[in-house]
Amino acid sequence: MMRSHYCGQLNETLEGQEITLCGWVHRRRDHGGVIFLDIRDRDGLAQVVFDPDRAESFAAADRVRSEYVVKITGKVRLRPAGAVNKNMASGGIEVLGYELEVLNESETPPFPLNEYSDVGEETRLRYRFLDLRRPEMAEKLRLRSRMTTSIRRFLDENGFLDVETPILTRATPEGARDYLVPSRTHAGSFFALPQSPQLFKQLLMVAGFDRYYQIAKCFRDEDLRADRQPEFTQIDIETSFLDEKEIMGLTEQMIRNLFKEVLDLEFGDFPHMTFEEAMRRYGSDKPDLRNPLELVDVADQLKDVDFKVFSGPANDPKCRIAALRVPGGASMPRKQIDDYTKFVGIYGAKGLAYIKVNERANGVDGLQSPIVKNIPLDNLNAILDRVGAVDGDIVFFGADKAKIVSEALGALRIKLGHDLNLLTCEWAPMWVVDFPMFEENDDGSFSALHHPFTAPKCSPAELEANPAGALSRAYDMVLNGTELGGGSIRIHRKEMQQAVFRLLGINEAEQEEKFGFLLDALKYGAPPHGGLAFGLDRLVMLMTGAQSIREVIAFPKTQSAADVMTQAPGVVDAKALRELHIRLRETPKAE
């Protein structure tokens, strides 16, 4: 081996020992004839001192520059008391350099790697191999590795088998667009890259493997956001002969173990909340419980008011009127309220009514709002009592279709929590359960809220008689308002699977064409089974405090699903296209 130690391994116990380091010159400093080099490797930093008394090594140190790759041999010694650097793991020692060999030189990097600089993300991604040298970026990937090691160890110890499933498969309707791969040997046919290993892991349960897991690559061709990538990684889990309570308990234990091992944080038992309660109180199926703000229904107090903006929705069973109290918000300037009004408009809200509670004892005169003149004082007081309003508060209102009100005020709740620093703790894990089986589309048809293979809490006959009211055996783990993972008990009987397909508008011919292999498998003694999948990238993002999952993936794509480093996707030559039986059509020019 070229080295004896990593930089991060050096400490006071090695005093007096001769060691050899290999790494990059992170920083070079010349202090009164003594040269200091900070050497960096994947494990950390170490300070090496070169003294003019050793002429050859001193001359070599004088020639090196930032990002040169070097091999250094020297002796570990304690730093003087006033020179200890508590910000470095090796800050109590330094290395007196004897020998320095330059293994490779470096051009000046396009951005500094040894200090913070506000570099555009595209530049960082273009030179990702340099960006990853920065200690804060390397630390994120080291933590990611520790996380997957912890997860694999836990699952191995609990009897799970790591089984790989196909990457080249066939397209199935799972919500997002598939990435398609043309087949050279089957002209006109295409493979699809998997959006998840869902059906294969269910087939492994039919095959009797009982407990499966995989750190799986998945692919979705969809519009990207801060927490989405076209290719992403799932911690994929499936079990047989366990019910939802047992699966949730096992995976909760895995996450608690992960946080303890990696961050030394201990969580208690995760609270459970139904989908209905989460939407009613927080306007979201993944509520952030660190935020104390809650939505409160007040339609019953507004049915008879002479104000159609409220009385209309209050008397419509498909609508909702909810109030959101913000403690101390009465001092909020009008511009800030206008900004929040524009914000809820993103979610379809037509406006944002409000009441500033200046002095409740003065009745209507103590309230500041354009709407109070339209609401009787008794009703106003009933609303303010219900939301717990006191002097100095502001109360926002949403009145519209139930979905719009929940989403708009739910998003406003999150924004207010961050803008006003209302969060009460650092971590708030939970489970959301009892999801609806389906969501109804505008045309009256149904879509699966999770996926078509989720088992309902009723019989096939009951499901088909009342699909809108059916609940599923699904469960989501949520942390700080982010869905960490979602899962369910699966359908293991053919007649139930066919009933769900029918309700989704998939006729028998299409069922056979797209899911014939699954329906066949369900005829041959499929066991009760269920599972869960965690988004690894999202989990790493939360545990490292990163702002985007692009920060925790070694080589991510941009928000336009491109790789600016390798220039992917790229043009394919005509010969390759002919072999794939593909002909490109020119895009018509705009007139």
Curated annotation (Swiss-Prot):
Keywords: Aminoacyl-tRNA synthetase, ATP-binding, Cytoplasm, Ligase, Nucleotide-binding, Protein biosynthesis. Its EC number is 6.1.1.23. It catalyses: tRNA(Asx) + L-aspartate + ATP = L-aspartyl-tRNA(Asx) + AMP + diphosphate. It is found in: Cytoplasm. It comes from the Bacteria. ATP binds at residues 220-222, 229, 483, 535-538. Residues 198-201 are annotated as: Aspartate. The keyword Transmembrane helix does not apply. GO terms for cellular component: cytoplasm. GO terms for biological process: aspartyl-tRNA aminoacylation. The record marks 31, 82 as: Important for tRNA non-discrimination. Belongs to the class-II aminoacyl-tRNA synthetase family. Type 1 subfamily. Homodimer. This is Aspartate--tRNA(Asp/Asn) ligase. The gene is aspS.
